UniProtKB/Swiss-Prot annotation:
Protein name, per record: Tryptophan synthase alpha chain
Reaction(s) catalysed (UniProt annotation): (1S,2R)-1-C-(indol-3-yl)glycerol 3-phosphate + L-serine = D-glyceraldehyde 3-phosphate + L-tryptophan + H2O
UniProt-listed Pfam families: Trp_syntA
Gene3D superfamilies: Aldolase class I
Protein purpose: The alpha subunit is responsible for the aldol cleavage of indoleglycerol phosphate to indole and glyceraldehyde 3-phosphate.
Catalytic-site annotation from UniProt: 50, 61
Enzyme Commission identifier(s): 4.2.1.20
InterPro entries associated with the record: Aldolase_TIM (IPR013785), RibuloseP-bd_barrel (IPR011060), Trp_synthase_alpha_AS (IPR018204), Trp_synthase_suA (IPR002028)
Keywords: Amino-acid biosynthesis, Aromatic amino acid biosynthesis, Lyase, Tryptophan biosynthesis
Length: 279
């Protein structure tokens, strides 16, 4: 099974450059605006899109992404509407991978079999479910793989050599290395330590290693890109969108332009880093 994720990373490896993975919250600040943001991301330089699934109790998310999820839920966003966003995006873009990221509860309530059927039909390529450990692979991971959807695991600085094989087992698409302990949006880890961690993980898997949590600026993204197959940026994009909203979370400026300006700058830095290193 070759997915869009596999194809994208193979293309980028051939080009000798890392990927830029961009996260935003589905439905933030409203469905229409969020869909416009999603459609604009690839043109701005995003190689992979992480589409957040809003949830009322996001334990791993920092204040910015928690607020984005709350805005989306208050605007009426549901899992069905998040899948609708993927389907609408696919009408215009059949190559950029979509990874849905969030928590298991909304999927469980929706119904696992129904969710996987609808996700596949909507053009979703991968899942990151942060609160579903490998011991629960039978719940969603294995059914997702059978449905042709990659299941992407998180590893952290505390994932030891005994735990790592369990995390990597049944993983596909890429491995998401959380660069520090804590919630999204916290301070970035020392890039040298990130490089050591990436090299260590690569001894156990051929999957691309993507590094995220704490990457906010083009300079930070470039530093991480020297070590990893991909850089993941989320909180900074969510903050760019939030900066164009009023105190009630309604659009007052241009969230699409704000998000795409940032993504363009991130993409240029990430791409230039590897090109400079190759010279």
């Amino acid at each position: 099974m070759t997915t869009r994720i596999d194809t994208k990373f193979a293309e980028l490896k051939a080009e000798g450059r890392p990927a830029l993975v961009t996260y935003f919250m589905g439905g933030d600040p409203d469905l229409e605006t969020a869909l416009k943001v999603m459609k604009a991301l690839p043109k701005a330089g995003a190689d992979v899109i992480e589409l957040g699934m809003p949830f009322s109790d996001p334990m791993a998310d920092g204040p910015a992404i928690q607020a984005a999820g709350l805005r989306a839920l208050n605007a009426g966003q549901t899992l069905a509407k998040t899948l609708y966003m993927a389907a609408e995006f696919r009408k215009e873009d059949d190559t950029t991978p979509i990874v849905m990221m969030g928590y298991y509860n909304p999927i469980y309530v929706y119904g696992v079999e129904r969710f996987l059927t609808d996700a596949k039909a909507s053009g979703v390529d991968g899942l990151i479910v942060v609160d579903l450990p490998s011991e629960m692979d039978a719940e969603l991971c294995i059914p997702a793989m059978k449905a042709g959807i990659n299941f992407i695991r998180l590893t952290t600085p505390t994932t030891d050599d005994k735990r790592l094989p369990k995390v990597l087992h049944n993983s596909s698409g890429f491995v998401y290395y959380v660069s520090m302990n804590g919630i999204t949006g916290a301070a970035i880890a020392d890039t040298a330590k990130v490089g050591e961690a990436v090299r260590h993980i690569k001894k156990s898997t051929d999957l691309p290693i993507c590094v995220g949590f704490g990457v906010k600026t083009p300079e930070q993204a470039a530093a991480i890109a020297t070590h990893a197959d991909s850089v993941v940026v989320g909180t900074a994009i969510v903050n760019a969108i939030a900066g164009e909203l009023d105190e009630k979370g309604k659009v007052k400026g241009d969230p699409v332009a704000a998000a795409t300006r940032l993504v363009h700058a991130l993409a240029e830095s990430v791409r230039a880093t590897r090109l400079e290193a190759a010279q």
